[in-house]
């Protein structure tokens, strides 16, 4: 083999030939982006069941890698604010339900009560908000690619699969935690009853569906450090792929 080349092993334990000058970069514990450009920003969608511990995973990624994290729930909240994309449609949908405060803000507790008893209205709300959230995500993705500031863009969304974000993400990651562990976390951290947890679990996708659609699975059943080490390995593997892609482009 050429002395300028080196065989390294990726996350799937397959050997990939890369330039030797990148080998030190690939085995650091964190991203070193000094040798790489941002014009091929990687877009990762992250999902998993309620109580899977996604918040800790996202916090670790944001703290240790050059990435931006977007939360679909926060985006949904934002697009429903007065003057934003969905607001006028929501005014029409909830015109008779007294869900708007005097200053125009939405009384979200009151809205939740209305939606709980009106399935048709809940579906109508989803048909308004979900497309607006997806369009916001697409716009931000395009801005990030143009700005070339972040190596990785991450979106966390409970409905990542249902809303077909695989169409715009480069890959999806599934944060896996057993139902038993998720139930314990939801009781301890959020005070949820078994009945509420059962209803939540019944409304979510099966583990097999998550695994079928998502490229990667992170086991978050044990210590946080165990999950973090899996993330480090995945991010190193993505860096190997990026270097290999860059080599191919330059040849």
Predicted regions and their residues:
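NTP-dependent small-molecule kinase module
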Residues: 25-41, 139-152, 166-175, 179-192, ...
